[in-house]
Amino acid sequence: MSRFLNVLRSWLVMVSIIAMGNTLQSFRDHTFLYEKLYTGKPNLVNGLQARTFGIWTLLSSVIRCLCAIDIHNKTLYHITLWTFLLALGHFLSELFVYGTAAPTIGVLAPLMVASFSILGMLVGLRYLEVEPVSRQKKRN
C-alpha cells in the first residue's frame, strides 16, 4: 500500500474519532451547537436539532472509520468522499445562505477539515487506481 494511502487512512481515523467526540457532545448538551457552530441564530438550536446533528455526525464517523479500515473498497471510498462533500455543503450553506453560522473557529475548523479531506481523497483516487495493477503484476 502506498505511503499516501496510509496517511489518508490515519487522517480518516483521526477525523472519525473527533466526530465521535462531537456526537457525544451533541447528545450531552445541545448548547454546544449554538455556542460553537450555529452562533448566527442560536434560538433555532434545540435538543432535537442537536440529536439529529449528533446522529448525522455519528453516521459520518462510522463511514469514515470503515473506509480507513477498507480503503480499497471503492464504493465505500466514494461514500466517504460524499460525507465530506455534504459536510462542506452544509456548513457553507449555514454560513452564507441561511445565516445560522458565523465565521468563527467553530465553523471554520469543519470547513477546513472537509476541504482538506476532499482534496486528500481526490488525490487518493489516483493511488487506488494504480495499486490493483501493481498487485496483479506481483502475482503473475
Swiss-Prot record:
An annotated GO BP: sterol biosynthetic process
InterPro entries recorded: Erg28
GO molecular function term, any single one: identical protein binding
Protein keywords: Endoplasmic reticulum, Lipid biosynthesis, Lipid metabolism, Membrane, Steroid biosynthesis, Steroid metabolism, Sterol biosynthesis, Sterol metabolism, Transmembrane, Transmembrane helix
Predominant localisation class: endoplasmic reticulum
Tissue expression pattern: Ubiquitous; strongly expressed in testis and some cancer cell lines.
Record Pfam families: Erg28 (PF03694)
One cellular component (GO) term of this entry: endoplasmic reticulum membrane
TM spans (from-to): 4-24, 52-72, 79-99, 105-125
Similarity comment: family membership: Belongs to the ERG28 family.
Name of the protein this chain belongs to: Ergosterol biosynthetic protein 28 homolog
Origin organism lineage: Eukaryota, Metazoa, Chordata, Craniata, Vertebrata
